């Protein structure tokens, strides 16, 4: 459907799996670990946020292969893991990191962008 979706962590992974992507185990467990991310593709979620920002990670599974209908919006700089995705047509977004965490200083801005600019 066309209902806006924002998948966070496991939700991000579930979106990829539902659309035919492939998941795998991360090379190392990233529970309570902070990484920098770089934006790869413009996304409404990152409007007003500077590139190369810290994010908090809590996961041991990653998206290894993206579904064709999606584009990668962000990757971690330390291990090049997929940290953000968006559907090319539908209002579906995923974030591997936790935007609600204190370890993601700009995370609430991403959530606010989703609510104000996608959900409306």
How should each PLM-predicted stretch be described?
Residues 1-43, 54, 111-113:
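Cysteine-nucleophile active-site neighborhood
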Residues 43-90:
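Catalytic beta-strand/loop cores that center a nucleophilic Ser/Cys/Thr
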Residues 34-36, 82-84, 94:
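Conserved hydrophobic/aromatic beta-strand scaffold that supports enzyme active sites
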Residues 52, 95-105:
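Phosphate-binding/catalytic loops
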Residues 6, 24, 56, 73, ...:
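Hydrophobic/aromatic beta-strand patches that form the interior of the parallel beta-sheet core
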Residues 102-120:
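Acyltransferase
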Residues 9, 59, 98:
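Histidine-centered divalent metal-coordination motifs
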